[in-house]
């Protein structure tokens, strides 16, 4: 195991901001390489506990493929505190979500494929990977500079582009475990110990998983349109590991085992680790809906994340103590279709328009 401290910024008083990068050299050149990061959002700490479990596993069981692990991936966000709460979801300078600052790799495939399209598959993949990394380096070297969030994101993205498998470990506010999975990799969702999957289309919205898989998906589609069948060479997922501001080592062990189950399936490790048998459900990303508060007030969250909710069943109670005289101090809200609540807002005090819940609609069974 090798440990490097990678500079990703500086504070106003001159102190450097660095992230720890743990590397394990694989024993087989044929095995896929893996990049795993955690804690890009300051309050989403459980992924660090999962990486600790993986570190201990790889020390005892040398992997076949190269492994790069980056816990504590956002030192500025992690240290962005207000009283007892960690903020750290948005760059405090620009207000942009830390997980929306990655580079959109807008490769001009007409020109690039004309020069590289006849290369052997692995040679072509290597050339494309070098291009993606070079684009990140070019963006970092912009003579006009980059924002704090972009500097962090580009350094993380460079690391991710070096791998065949990219896992970004997050949590929700108050949340059940769920997985963001690209549509072309849906069969892999059954290996993680996660019951709910959001199926992602091709496209880029600024997040790490999209930054990792979207260029390769575009390359595959372009090659196929030119009569050459190319697989999507990179697999990328976002794992949402429950709720923020929470460390649970026993739960981290279960999540690490789910990751190892997937890595076993991909032959990154020599050990055979079977996925947990569970009911799994999915919906398309377009059917993952947000419910916004139609009124302000104090909220009693009634629907438990991860428990199916029938149409018309109580979702929340809204308390308005300014309406006691009118007898309308409690308003019960529900939805008009069957859903699976996935997460809800962390605070019980909300403005009108606050995102109260995210729910799966039009969901379907993946496996039993």
Model-derived regions: residue spans:
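Structured catalytic-domain cores with a bias toward divalent-metal coordination
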Residues: 1-368
């Amino acid at each position: 195991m090798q440990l490097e401290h990678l500079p990703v910024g500086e504070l106003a008083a001159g102190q450097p901001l660095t992230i720890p990068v743990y590397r394990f050299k694989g024993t087989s050149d044929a095995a896929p390489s893996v990049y795993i990061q955690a804690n890009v959002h300051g309050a989403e700490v459980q992924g660090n506990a999962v990486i600790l479990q993986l570190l201990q596993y790889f020390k005892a069981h040398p992997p076949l493929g190269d492994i790069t692990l980056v816990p504590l991936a956002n030192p500025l966000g992690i240290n962005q505190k207000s009283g007892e709460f960690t903020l750290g979801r948005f760059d405090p300078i620009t207000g942009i979500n830390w997980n929306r600052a990655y580079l959109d790799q807008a490769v001009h495939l007409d020109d690039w494929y004309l020069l590289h399209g006849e290369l052997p598959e692995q040679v072509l993949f290597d050339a494309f990977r070098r291009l993606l990394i070079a684009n990140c380096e070019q963006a970092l070297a912009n003579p006009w500079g980059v924002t704090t969030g972009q500097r962090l994101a580009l350094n993380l993205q460079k690391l991710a582009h070096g791998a065949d498998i990219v896992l970004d470990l997050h949590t929700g506010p108050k949340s059940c475990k769920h997985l963001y999975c690209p549509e072309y990799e849906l069969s892999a969702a059954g290996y993680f110990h996660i019951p709910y999957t959001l199926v992602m289309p091709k496209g880029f919205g600024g997040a790490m998983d999209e930054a990792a898989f979207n260029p390769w998906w575009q390359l595959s589609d372009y090659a196929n349109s030119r009569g050459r069948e190319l697989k999507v060479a990179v697999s990328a997922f976002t794992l949402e590991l429950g709720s923020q501001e929470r460390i649970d080592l026993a739960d981290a062990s279960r999540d690490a085992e789910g990751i190892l189950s997937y890595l076993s399936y991909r032959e990154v490790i020599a050990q055979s680790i079977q996925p947990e048998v569970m009911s799994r459900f999915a919906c398309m990303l377009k059917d993952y809906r947000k419910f916004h508060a139609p009124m302000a007030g104090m909220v009693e969250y009634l629907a438990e994340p991860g428990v199916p909710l029938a149409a018309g069943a109580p979702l929340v109670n809204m308390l308005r103590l300014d309406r006691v005289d009118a007898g309308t101090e409690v308003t019960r809200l529900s939805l008009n279709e069957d859903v699976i609540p996935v997460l809800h807002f962390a605070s019980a005090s909300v403005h009108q328009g606050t995102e109260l819940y995210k729910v799966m609609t039009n969901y379907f069974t993946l496996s039993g």
